[in-house]
Amino acid sequence: MTTIVSVRRNNQVVIAGDGQVSLGNTVMKGNARKVRRLYHNKVLAGFAGGTADAFTLFERFEAKLEMHQGHLLKSAVELAKDWRTDKMLRKLEAMLVVADTEASLIITGNGDVVQPEHDLIAIGSGGNYAQAAALALLQNTELSAQEIADKSLTIAGDICVFTNQFKTIEQLDY
């Protein structure tokens, strides 16, 4: 599995992820990029779950963004509808975190599109650890969104055996 965290603070949104790819209890790769920029670098996206499944979803989501001229919520809802109703897509096991300058969302295969509380999202095997760390940092420090995402991933990686310390961090300023 993996850990993906998204933090929004002070006109900055960040999505960060670790790089570990596991097959069962074996680490297959330690430097995977699970966070990407989409739609002319205006949308950030990260995934947790099956790598091949996530790439399929990235492609579908990017097509939805193109179709809806970069409108994040409409694209997310359309992807979630397809994911829930299409027999092939329904078998995909991944979750997406997406963000632009307006919103941050979680998209699941159950057809859920969720906008989080506290401008904070964390998914994957280390998601609960990263979320707790990020929430504490949001409430008790003046750190930037990028610093909070970085530190919360470090903490998750220290606790979760399916999360490592190789990080990909993408940021949008607005």
Curated annotation (Swiss-Prot):
InterPro entries: ATP-dep_Prtase_HsIV_su, Ntn_hydrolases_N, Proteasome_sua/b, Proteasome_suB-type. Its EC number is 3.4.25.2. The active site is at T2. Pfam families: Proteasome. It catalyses: ATP-dependent cleavage of peptide bonds with broad specificity. Disulfide bonds: none annotated. It comes from the Bacteria. It is found in: Cytoplasm. The keyword Protease applies. GO terms for biological process: proteolysis involved in protein catabolic process. The keyword Transmembrane helix does not apply. Na(+) binds at G157, C160, T163. One of its GO terms (molecular function) is metal ion binding. Allosterically activated by HslU binding. Keywords: Allosteric enzyme, Cytoplasm, Hydrolase, Metal-binding, Protease, Sodium, Threonine protease. Coiled coil: none annotated. GO terms for cellular component: HslUV protease complex; proteasome core complex. Belongs to the peptidase T1B family. HslV subfamily. A double ring-shaped homohexamer of HslV is capped on each side by a ring-shaped HslU homohexamer. The assembly of the HslU/HslV complex is dependent on binding of ATP. Protease subunit of a proteasome-like degradation complex believed to be a general protein degrading machinery. This is ATP-dependent protease subunit HslV. The lineage of its organism: Bacteria, Pseudomonadati, Pseudomonadota, Gammaproteobacteria, Alteromonadales.
